[in-house]
Amino acid sequence: MLENRVKTKQIFIGGVAIGGDAPISTQSMTFSKTADIESTKNQIDRLKLAGADLVRVAVSNEKDALALKELKKVSPLPLIADIHFHYKFALIAAQSVDAIRINPGNIGSKDKIKAVVDACKEKNIPIRIGVNAGSLEKQFDQKYGPTPKGMVESALYNAKLLEDLDFTDFKISLKASDVMRTIEAYRMLRPLVIYPFHLGVTEAGNLFSSSIKSAMALGGLLMEGIGDTMRVSITGELENEIKVARAILRHSGRLKEGINWISCPTCGRIEANLVDMASKVEKRLSHIKTPLDISVMGCVVNALGEAKHADMAIAFGNRSGLIIKEGKVIHKLAEKDLFETFVIEVENLAKEREKSLKD
């Protein structure tokens, strides 16, 4: 685990700590109409099962705002209300939810922001100042355009507004739709404030596009010690946002959990359908949370070398294959018996490791 993380002020969203020494949390956003409590609850349940720590819901009208009271009662995750344009919806939402997200570029005047702050103070809930490059306040957009400098100036201006109202329980996000502006904005602001950062690339595209952008931007920032909570925005299935976010946390050294998959890119030596087999193995073992390095190889040439560094490896040969545990061959089996035996061995190893950690 990396030890270079920037220490920030800690806030709480429900029972989830954000900032300080707290683990970096993941979140997503439901796409149902929030007033449809059954559908929204179903999506929150899916996110909980996928490993999300927090959930955000859109509050587009008064009906959505009023539904939050009942939704909060059934939500298994802390609830963040996402408010644009209509500050009065934030006043209603603050009575029920665990946090409020506002976009200072469209929420309105200082008086409206003060009203939101007062409501959050009363309920002791935090705010996210959500700055987006595409919707900066007029004074910053005209002076700087949708640039990192413009985003940072907006964030500083709004942080000062909240501080002047004697309110410091907030986090900040600086989102653009491309990697470089996102990284530069967060880097620029980090030494200027003590508040926790919510990381994200906004409107990042489909699964492929978003995974690349988010891995580069968020992974890069995380490895620099920047970031306290995050969302990977994907045009697609909710669960993928959490799956990709947790993978980024693992591979940037911020989360020690789950399997690190090692598999070869295939070549003329492979003697099995490695693409299907690697996918099948990963799906079958996706429930494992124990940190393990697992190797799936299409021939013994690569496998014997890679297996020296893997906790468990499988190597396919001509209608047969090897299972290798911690560098030693423990099974040579016919192809038809390889898969199930390998799954059992990995699950047993995970149990052994968990037991040793508890002991």
From Swiss-Prot:
Where along the chain is [4Fe-4S] cluster bound?
264, 267, 299, 306
| Pathway named in the protein's UniProt entry | Isoprenoid biosynthesis; isopentenyl diphosphate biosynthesis via DXP pathway; isopentenyl diphosphate from 1-deoxy-D-xylulose 5-phosphate: step 5/6
Q: Which GO terms describe its molecular function?
A: 4 iron, 4 sulfur cluster binding; 4-hydroxy-3-methylbut-2-en-1-yl diphosphate synthase activity (ferredoxin); 4-hydroxy-3-methylbut-2-enyl-diphosphate synthase activity (flavodoxin); iron ion binding
Q: Could you mention a single GO BP entry for this protein?
A: isopentenyl diphosphate biosynthetic process, methylerythritol 4-phosphate pathway
Identify the cofactor(s). [4Fe-4S] cluster
Give a short account of what the protein does.
Converts 2C-methyl-D-erythritol 2,4-cyclodiphosphate (ME-2,4cPP) into 1-hydroxy-2-methyl-2-(E)-butenyl 4-diphosphate.
Which PANTHER family does this entry report, sorted A to Z? 4-HYDROXY-3-METHYLBUT-2-EN-1-YL DIPHOSPHATE SYNTHASE (PTHR30454), 4-HYDROXY-3-METHYLBUT-2-EN-1-YL DIPHOSPHATE SYNTHASE (FERREDOXIN), CHLOROPLASTIC (PTHR30454:SF0)
What family name appears in the similarity comment?
A: Belongs to the IspG family.
Q: Name one Pfam family in it.
A: GcpE
Please share the entry's free-text remark on the cofactor.
Binds 1 [4Fe-4S] cluster.
Query: Catalytic activity, per the record?
Result: (2E)-4-hydroxy-3-methylbut-2-enyl diphosphate + oxidized [flavodoxin] + H2O + 2 H(+) = 2-C-methyl-D-erythritol 2,4-cyclic diphosphate + reduced [flavodoxin]
Look up the EC number in the record and give it. 1.17.7.3
Q: What is this protein called?
A: 4-hydroxy-3-methylbut-2-en-1-yl diphosphate synthase (flavodoxin)
UniProt entry keywords in alphabetical sequence? 4Fe-4S, Iron, Iron-sulfur, Isoprene biosynthesis, Metal-binding, Oxidoreductase
Q: Which organism is it from?
A: Helicobacter pylori (strain HPAG1)
